[in-house]
Structures are given as C-alpha cells and as structure tokens.
Amino acid sequence: MERKMKAEIAVMTAENIDRKAIARGGEILKNGGLVAFPTETVYGLGGNALDPKASMKIYAAKGRPSDNPLIVHIADIRDLDKIVTEVPEKARVLAEKYWPGPLTMILPKADIVPKETTGGLDSVAVRFPSDRIAQELILAAGGYVAAPSANTSGRPSPTTAGHVAEDLGEAIDMIIDGGQVNIGLESTIVDFTEDIPVVLRPGYISLEMLRETLGDVRIDRKSVV
C-alpha cells in the first residue's frame, strides 16, 4: 500500500512572518493543494475558493458532505465585490464594524464562485479574518481561500497546529503553525440574502452585539452549527 506523505510544517508568528513559507503556501493553494493555517478563531483548512477541484479536496479531507458550503476568506475588503453580486447596506455597516474579525456574512454569489465551493447554493459565505498570518497567506494565494475548520467532520475545531497535524497531517500538503489561536470560537454567521438578517451560527459576535448594530435580527433554530 502506498505510504501517505505527512504535511510540510512551517512555524511562524504574526510578529515574525516567514515570507518564504507564506509564498510556498500560496503556490500550493494556487496549484490546487490544501494548506491549514491559523485564524483568530480556529485553524482553517484552506483551498483555492475559485477552483472547484480544490473545494472537492477539502470535502474529501474532512469527510464533509459536499452540500455543506465552505466559507471564502478574503484579505482585502475591496475583494468582496468580485465574488458577490450585492452587498446590502446593513451588511456593509456590519462589515465596517467587525471586519477584519470573527464575522461571516452570506451574500448572493457572483458567477466566478463555483457551486462546489458554495455547496450548490446561489449564495456565498465570506469572512475577512484579522489574523496577520491568514491575511498574508490569502493574498499570496490570489485573494480567495475557502477554509472550513481544519478537522475531520465530527471532531472539535482545532486551536493549535498540533491538533491539525494529528487529525489531517497525512491528508493535506502544508500546515502553517502560528501557535495557539486568540479566540478559539467559531465565527458568527449572518445571512443577508433575506430582508431581515438571520443568524445561522452563533459565535464570538453575540446576538446582542448584532442587534446593537442592525436592529432586527432573527435566529435560524434549525441551522446546523
């Protein structure tokens, strides 16, 4: 039986970023590979968000159903308009307050985003993380990285690179070890495709914080967290 290769590991901090390793990670992502990396919430399992084959690799590595949408990570607010067709005013207000940060917004997707990335939906989940390592990697990869949590489905979301290596070390190409994440709690997901914003997943940004900014907000009780 063919022996699986262990992921390449690069260690760095937000204060001392390894530019060569970031460039290497960016090339892996551009070429359809998978790179795990730190964000302020949990470690993400990254693939090129605009490459349908890369998105399918993410589903396979996680053992995740392919109809479960992936979150697209950006590192420049100006890149949002390329992957969505509309940004409601309330979404822009929330982004101004909480981006970069642990907020994911669901918006109508542009044609450039493949259905494999969105789980077949006409909307796309987008986040602008505040972690500097994540931002540098996303930019090196071309600006759009699909990244759910870097764990096999059903396991806890990883807060260290060691967790990722133990779980996915033989299924992915590279792990960027940025140490312990700052928050350790998933991003809050808010759907802006309806008239009233809907919280699909509670997270670091609380319902009270959202209502302070948006006013009326609903919670989807049926949503799978």
Give residue ranges: language-model regions:
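Active-site-adjacent structural elements in enzyme catalytic cores
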Residues: E2-V225
